[in-house]
């Protein structure tokens, strides 16, 4: 997937699946809303949620975003998360972007305003996942791993480097 396509894909209200680690090392997955800022994924949660406690204990995580419409694609990213908490960090502007993306666009202002007002009553924090590994596949052109690498190389003008 090209960078512009990836940004457009991640701007849509697709639900992501976040993987965290349990204390014993087993993965724990949970559906999440996220906001991609071009460098990192922002995810909101509450201190009471299991996955939030896991990230506060061990910041390693993976986020998978898969969709079949309007564009069939997949984005996966792995990396450490950093917790951002009140009062040191104002979590509300990013939280408002999440509400706009997932509530306001599909359901309108009244639903979004009510949802956001409820969020502000909860003991919330934000996590910022800055990927150290990133995968993006556009299923419209995907014909297997090798063909995908060749397509990406043609699009970026580096075909000779990817023919290995």
Q: What function would you assign to each model-found segment?
A:
Residues 3-4, 48-49, 113:
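Structural motif corresponding to alpha-helix initiation and N-cap regions
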Residues 6-7, 52, 95, 116:
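Short amphipathic alpha-helical segments and helix-helix/interface helices
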Residues 73-164:
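Charged, gly/pro-rich active-site loop segments
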Residues 9-12, 71, 123:
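A short, polar/charged loop/turn motif at coil->beta-strand junctions and beta-hairpin connectors
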Residues 1-17:
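Short, basic/aromatic recognition patches
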Residues 13-47, 53, 61-67, 74-76:
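Short beta-strand segments
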Residues 66-68, 131-132:
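Short secondary-structure boundary segments
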Residues 58:
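Acidic-histidine catalytic/liganding microenvironments
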